[in-house]
Amino acid sequence: MKEDKVYIKYKEFAKYYKLSNYDTKKLWRIIEPIATHKEFSKRCSDPYFHHDIKSLGDHILCDAIVTYKLATKLKRNSQNMKDINIDNAVVIAMFHDLYELPWQNIGVKKIMRNKHGFVHPIEAITNAITWYPEYFKSKERAMIIIDGVIHHMFPLALRRIDNTDMELNNKEKYDKLPQKYKDMIKLSTDIGKIGHYSLRKSFFIEGRIMSRADKIVALKKDIGSFNGYLALISGKNKNIKKKHNKNGDKNEIRNKQS
């Protein structure tokens, strides 16, 4: 097994969350095809800071670990949870935040409903389908994964697909998606619609488990400062600027769109 930087990070997080050696190896077998992709690896370092100064890739790996632990515990201990598909829950975790561009300290202005917090689930599922099409061959599995990713922010709302411009950072990829996937994404956002938004939890237990894991990781481990919490509202994080200044870079991260 190659000891690349993503795997080394994964082992550190598995130890932090007290995953057994057996489960550490088992979970890695599930996520390895996703975690070793070049696009995932890119999101494990600067400039992809997700919450505070924690990288996006680090956040996703931690979400996958906590999702695995929650799903495994529920499946083992609850009689009515025996049908939980642990693999699907973990895959949702690995895909849920695969958005296109860093979102903190960028200079691009968008209308409120098209800001990062509302549209990033659509960007994430678009990238997941584009980069990992093998996970979406089965219509049933595709719907479970899509719905879980789209509604992982619950109880927060997301942008509904309603034929108005979403200002997606990966619009070209979205436009190239096969129509069947666009239809599934739209269906997922139409249910629970409130104006330009959609507000509901995932229909599927795997998505609900992942959504819970996401809150545990974000609120208990990712964000460790006032500036980090403030960035969730303002999109500007002074901690990133301080980190860059400490490393000799006096410029904030800028969004370099091609």
Predicted regions mapped to residue ranges:
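Metal-dependent phosphohydrolase cores
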Residues: 1-258
